[in-house]
């Protein structure tokens, strides 16, 4: 009998130790639950519960086993819940927007391509494969990629070759934009890249400030020169104001006589105007109007030249000899030569 009491006391001490260790893991059950741990821990087992060898009956043992089984399920459920939370946390961290601008993303895609050029669809495929954030939000950001390609000078459009089938043009980087990012880091950009010279012709010629034509690949910067008279070469023939211009003959058919008459501008200017001579309406004036066309026709009998017309305009347009000499001397002293230009 004493042996049975010692064994019961030993089991009771083990139960107290188990409660202290797993007190946080076990849920509190109701008082009427037959498998409640309180009914076995805080109550003294009776003789009816004990067997012949001083152990608990199978019914109580099954209760303890079920309690331990339920606690194991709760532990597995707790660990599973924590795993789900960790998994969800990883998914949320993967969907964070990358710290790169659209220009940086396009630059990365083009630089990692084999031929250093990609189409719009190729750029979008690269971004979607490398960044899951943009993969889930495609194609909402495709228009942003298209706008950045067309509005930034650092990207150059390359037409597709005739023998290369496909849709869309290629895009590549401007060779002068290699230093666009600070120390090669795509997180920071120094400033917006702008082309230094504007392309004016399709054949690749660029017009610079002093009206020189050079290829766009040559990095030449035109120097600013003051607005002065240009130097006139020595072999350049400048017409003098004393040299008469060649006569220009114009033949006009005459409907009255059927012959060609040669008109002269001097006779037109020398012809007196009689518009204000007679203002009264008389028979003589009316009869005299029929004779005026003959006078006009007879006055165009000489050669028509431009000497008198260009005499005044030539003096205004062309500088005098002294001005040309001074301009030529000052231009020879201040000639500026630009390398690489004709």
From Swiss-Prot:
Segments for region (Disordered): 1-89
Regions of compositional bias (Acidic residues) in chain numbering: 20-34
InterPro entries: Fork_head_dom, FOX_domain-containing, TF_fork_head_CS_1, TF_fork_head_CS_2, WH-like_DNA-bd_sf, WH_DNA-bd_sf
Pfam families documented for this protein: Forkhead
DNA-binding region listed in the record: 97-191
Domain of life: Eukaryota
Nucleus listed as a keyword: yes
Keyword field: DNA-binding, Nucleus, Repressor, Transcription, Transcription regulation
GO-annotated cellular components: nucleus
Tissue specificity comment: At the onset of gastrulation, expressed in the superficial layer of cells in the dorsal blastopore lip (Spemann organizer). In the open neural plate, expressed in a row of cells destined to become the floor plate of the neural tube. After neural tube closure, only detected in the tailtip and a small area located at the midbrain/hindbrain boundary.
SMART domains: FH
Keyword Hydrolase: no
Compositionally biased residues, Polar residues: 59-70
Chief subcellular location: nucleus
Record CDD domains: FH_FOXD4-like
SUPFAM superfamilies referenced in this protein's UniProt entry, alphabetically: Winged helix' DNA-binding domain
One GO BP annotation of this record: negative regulation of DNA-templated transcription
GO MF term list: DNA binding; DNA-binding transcription factor activity; DNA-binding transcription factor activity, RNA polymerase II-specific; RNA polymerase II cis-regulatory region sequence-specific DNA binding
Location(s) in or outside the cell: Nucleus
Segments of skewed composition (Basic and acidic residues): 71-83
Function, in words: Transcriptional repressor.
Protein name: Forkhead box protein D5-C
């Amino acid at each position: 009998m004493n042996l049975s009491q010692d064994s019961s006391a030993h089991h009771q001490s083990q139960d107290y130790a188990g409660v202290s260790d797993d007190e946080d893991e076990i849920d509190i059950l109701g008082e009427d639950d037959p498998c409640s741990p309180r009914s076995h821990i805080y109550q003294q087992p009776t003789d009816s519960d004990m067997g012949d060898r001083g152990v608990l009956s199978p019914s109580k043992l099954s209760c303890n086993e079920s309690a331990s089984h339920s606690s194991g399920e709760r532990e597995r459920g707790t660990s599973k819940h924590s795993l789900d939370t960790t998994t969800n946390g990883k998914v949320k961290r993967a969907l964070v927007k990358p710290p790169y601008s659209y220009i940086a993303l396009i630059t990365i895609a083009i630089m990692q391509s084999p031929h250093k050029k990609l189409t719009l669809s190729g750029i979008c495929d690269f971004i979607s494969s490398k960044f899951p954030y943009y993969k889930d939000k495609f194609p909402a950001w495709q228009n942003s990629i298209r706008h950045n390609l067309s509005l930034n000078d650092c990207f150059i459009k390359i037409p597709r070759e005739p023998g290369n089938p496909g849709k869309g043009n290629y895009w590549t980087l401007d060779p002068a934009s290699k230093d666009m990012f600070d120390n090669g880091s795509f997180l920071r950009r120094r400033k917006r890249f702008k082309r230094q010279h504007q392309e004016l012709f399709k054949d690749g010629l660029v017009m610079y400030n002093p009206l020189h034509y050079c290829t766009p690949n040559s990095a030449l910067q035109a120097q600013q020169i003051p607005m002065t008279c240009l130097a006139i070469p020595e072999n350049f023939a400048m017409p003098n104001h004393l040299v008469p211009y060649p006569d220009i003959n114009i033949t006009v058919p005459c409907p009255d006589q059927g012959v060609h008459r040669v008109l002269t501008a001097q006779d037109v200017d020398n012809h007196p105007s009689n518009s204000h001579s007679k203002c009264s309406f008389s028979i003589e004036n009316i009869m005299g109007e029929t004779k005026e066309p003959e006078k006009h026709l007879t006055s165009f009998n000489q050669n028509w030249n431009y000497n008198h017309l260009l005499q005044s305009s030539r003096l205004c347009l062309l500088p005098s000899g002294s001005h040309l000499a001074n301009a030529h001397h000052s231009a020879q002293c201040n000639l500026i030569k630009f390398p690489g230009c004709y």
